[in-house]
Amino acid sequence: LGRVDHQDAYLDYDNQERERGITIYSKEAHFHWKDSEIYLIDTPGHVDFSSEMERSLQVLDLAILLINGQDGIQSHTSTIWKCLKHYKIPTLIFINKMDISYKTQEELMNDLKTHFSSNCINFKSEDAEDELSMLNEDIMNHYLETEEIDSSLLQQAIFKRECFPVFFGSALKIQGIEDLMDAIIDLSFIQDYPEDFGARVYKISSDDQGNRLTHVKITGGVLNAKDKVGTDEKVDQIRLYNGKQFEMVQTAYPGMICALKGLNKYEVGQGLGFESDLSLIHI
């Protein structure tokens, strides 16, 4: 298990990150959990690197807002929350370091409901089902008829930002992590992607050989290695990164986060295919 204070966190491999013990650059990873494939972007939480975090928001299907249980909601936490609202990103909340926090779950939930939304709900509490049943009329009617929360209606409510599931635990002690991972799978709204090709650029980087990499999320259709993008550029390689390591694939499908080698003209926020360009809000 990698630890920031041991300078061996899997995604914080940059020398500056290991020296300072914080995330500076957004990183990608992908993995399987219970027959589902998850594409993860780990972003900085420090206020000095807000722009790096914001660039990643535009390609997220779901955000996990990580809050230190010792500190609770800080001013920068509220800023990130406003960004998530601006980009209309469905959000789960994980309260970390509960093994050493002097605050109770009830105290932290009161803070979340006061500062963020009354629809922040502790999914492991005894009152969770009652709170969920009152999210909207459709969920309530189904609950009154069946005494169960309809999973598809709940997914839609989370997708529409009508509900913000909250989980508590400790990453270091591996407490609450399985509940969070299950929630990512069970509560995510499955999107339908168009058949036409589209992608969104969220990051530009260079590899160890100095090759320019254009990091994108595929939002429709498929992209093959050697395909032309735009009028005069060709994708030489499609890379799937896991931290510092990567594998090359022949085809990228909708929902994938990948890095494209061979493109030199695209910048952060630009769209490929049917996607239009976006402007960032610059927090």
Write out the residue ranges for each language-model feature:
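P-loop NTPase switch module centered on the Walker A-proximal segment
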Residues: 1-59, 63-67, 73, 116, ...
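Active-site phosphate-binding and catalytic loops of NTP-dependent enzymes
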Residues: 2-25, 118-123, 150, 186-197, ...
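Short beta-alpha junctions and helix-cap segments that line functional grooves
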Residues: 13-14, 27, 50-53, 76-81, ...
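Residue-level signature of catalytic and energy-coupling elements of molecular machines
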Residues: 21, 42, 56, 64, ...
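Surface-exposed loop and edge beta-strand positions of immunoglobulin-like domains
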Residues: 41, 67, 169, 216-219, ...
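P-loop NTPase catalytic nucleotide-binding module
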Residues: 69-208, 227-229, 258
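Conserved nucleotide-binding/hydrolysis modules and their immediate coupling elements
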Residues: 187-188, 194-279
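Conserved small/polar residues in nucleotide/adenosyl-binding loops
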Residues: 281-283
